[in-house]
Amino acid sequence: MASVFLIDLGNEAAEMIAGVFSIERHTVRRKPSRLDTRELRNAAMIFAGGGPKQYLPLLRQVRRELPRMPFVVVNDGADTRAWLEAIEAGATDYFCTPVARRQIQWLMQSIMPASTRGLDVRIPLGWSSAAAD
């Protein structure tokens, strides 16, 4: 399974994100923004918060050293300027708190390689008229 790093996230966002990844049996590590990026080399994904002063320098450093690393910014509230700065700096995505479980699941399914995700063994039991359209 994969390692996911949660850097400077608030408790509510960190618990939601960690909960989704731990169901899939991934390792979740909480870290402060002042860390050596060598620690991140084996990560499958990074979620960072704490405000632009914390996550932007880390994001820029990760983009220089690990350009393909999925890096998701998690910010308190919708802030167009912070969103634009994060995306321009190379963020993979930008979430506003509160983070929805479905956002995290969608991101995990779209970014992480199938080999690092658990298998989805749900079987659809019902029929939906929407599926027939």
Language model region names:
Residues 115-133:
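CheY-like receiver
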Residues 85-86:
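Residue preferences within the helical output face of two-component receiver
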Residues 99-108:
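C-terminal output helix
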Residues 14, 34-66, 75-82:
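Conserved phosphotransfer microenvironments
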Residues 7-31:
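Two-component/phosphorelay signaling modules centered on CheY-like receiver
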